[in-house]
Amino acid sequence: MKPMYRSRSWRRKYVRTPGGRTVIHFERRKPKVAHCAMCGRPLNGVPRGRPSELRKLPKTAKRPERPYPNLCPSCMRKVIKAQVRASLS
């Protein structure tokens, strides 16, 4: 095993070859799930992937197509309500 692969930042994937041997493939770990900027809840509709994988996706697949895509839907509603109330008063 190369010294660079001894670190646990590389995920070890055990692969069975056609010849019957089990070999280890090293791959980078997936990043953590995206979280809401206000409450910290995990965001739906945002894929977990390395930048090289996300680069291949269209922009619409990377984040929700609605106002404030960095907030969860409930926090987004709170922000929009606060803005409307502020503009009315």
From Swiss-Prot:
Q: Which organism is it from?
A: Thermococcus gammatolerans (strain DSM 15229 / JCM 11827 / EJ3)
Instruction: Name any GO cellular component annotation.
Output: ribonucleoprotein complex
As for family, the record states: Belongs to the eukaryotic ribosomal protein eL34 family.
Q: Which UniProt keywords apply?
A: Ribonucleoprotein, Ribosomal protein
Q: What is this protein called?
A: Large ribosomal subunit protein eL34
Q: Name one Pfam family in it.
A: Ribosomal_L34e
InterPro entries reported for this sequence: Ribosomal_eL34, Ribosomal_eL34_C_sf, Ribosomal_eL34_CS, Ribosomal_L34e_arc-type
**One GO biological process from the UniProt record?**
translation
Gene name of the record: rpl34e
Q: Does the keyword Ribonucleoprotein apply?
A: yes
Q: Where is this region: Disordered?
A: 41-69
Q: Offer an example of a GO molecular function term for this protein.
A: structural constituent of ribosome
- Coiled-coil positions are none
Q: Where is the composition biased (Basic and acidic residues)?
A: 50-66
